[in-house]
Curated annotation (Swiss-Prot):
Its EC number is 1.5.1.5, 3.5.4.9. NADP(+) binds at G166, A167, S168, I232. Belongs to the tetrahydrofolate dehydrogenase/cyclohydrolase family. Gene3D superfamilies: Leucine Dehydrogenase, chain A, domain 1 (3.40.50.10860), NAD(P)-binding Rossmann-like Domain (3.40.50.720). GO terms for molecular function: methenyltetrahydrofolate cyclohydrolase activity; methylenetetrahydrofolate dehydrogenase (NADP+) activity. Pathway: One-carbon metabolism; tetrahydrofolate interconversion. It comes from Actinobacillus succinogenes (strain ATCC 55618 / DSM 22257 / CCUG 43843 / 130Z). This is Bifunctional protein FolD. HAMAP family: THF_DHG_CYH. It comes from the Bacteria. One of its GO terms (biological process) is tetrahydrofolate interconversion.
Length: 285
């Protein structure tokens, strides 16, 4: 049977349309527009692209995006002071600090400074802890988006063996918690894992997030598996490639996400969902 490509582009479009509809409904009831503060420190080209995409989505669906483009020389104290002001601002529902930050700024301290109820990236220890305790509120956007992509396959995830390649705080670790919550048996692999191939070959669901082009050999994919490729790497030829050898993997998988057009659009869409959630909780507090 031919592989089914899971389109993140289509699902993201649908998701953002639903969020926009909810926002219009709230505004018709006399509520203010949701507010999202987006902070960018420095001029990293990739970060500028990501931030631009997030701001564009806000404009499309009716979220007031407040931009804070700060110079590379911004001190940690200055950034924390801005976050404190935004935490107190009743018109700001979400605060997003684009990572990575310059080396002289402690990203952990910055993430922890954001009020948990405004942490729309889902990185604050409080929100990660709630996910671990099976009571999630604001969830890390990429894993959250991946779970929505998995829903479109129609599979019952209970009891499936999910293997995650990469154990980052942004994707791998919260992804493990999401899949546990969905009833999967979860294996997390990382740079110290021995015999990675053996683990990958057993995966009913494979999530790869290492940032290395075509790191996973397509021949390793278990027949009928679902492959979620989080990586997005630009080669010397200018083409974008994922962390998995797509063509070979597609010969064996039942479902696979493309690069681009797979996980990436859903990450931004779930940021919009989280901002709406924070906005709703603000009024229901």
């Amino acid at each position: 049977m031919a592989v089914q490509v899971i389109s993140g582009t289509e699902l993201a479009k649908k998701t953002k349309s639903e969020v926009a509809g909810q926002i219009r409904r709230y505004i018709s009831l006399g509520r203010r527009v949701p507010g999202l503060a987006v902070i960018l420190v420095g001029s990293d080209p990739a970060s500028q692209v990501y931030v631009g995409s997030k701001r564009k989505s806000c404009a499309e669906i009716g979220i007031d995006s407040k931009s804070y483009d700060l110079p590379e020389t911004t001190t940690e104290a200055e950034l924390l002071s801005i976050i404190d002001d935004l935490n107190r601002n009743p018109n700001v529902d979400g605060i997003l600090v684009q990572l990575p930050l310059p080396k002289h700024i402690d990203s952990t301290k910055v993430i922890e400074r954001i009020a948990p109820n405004k942490d729309v990236d889902g990185f604050h220890p409080y929100n990660v802890g709630r996910l671990c305790q099976r009571i999630p509120t604001l969830r890390a956007c990429t894993p959250y988006g991946i779970m929505k992509l998995l829903e479109t396959t129609g599979q019952d995830l209970h009891g499936l063996h999910a293997v995650i390649v990469g154990a980052s705080n942004i994707v791998g670790r919260p992804m493990a918690m999401e899949l546990l919550l969905a009833g999967c048996t979860v294996t997390v692999t990382h740079r110290f894992t021995r015999d990675l191939e053996e683990h990958v070959r057993r995966a009913d669901i494979l999530v790869v997030a290492v940032g290395k082009a075509e790191f996973i050999n397509g021949d390793w994919i278990k027949p009928g598996a679902t492959v979620i490729d989080v990586g997005i790497n630009r080669g010397e030829d200018g083409k974008l490639r994922g962390d998995v050898q797509y063509a070979k993997a597609a010969e064996k998988a039942a479902f696979i996400t493309p690069v681009p057009g797979g996980v990436g659009p859903m990450t931004v869409a779930m940021l919009m969902v989280n901002t709406l959630t924070a906005y709703e909780r603000h009024f229901n507090a």
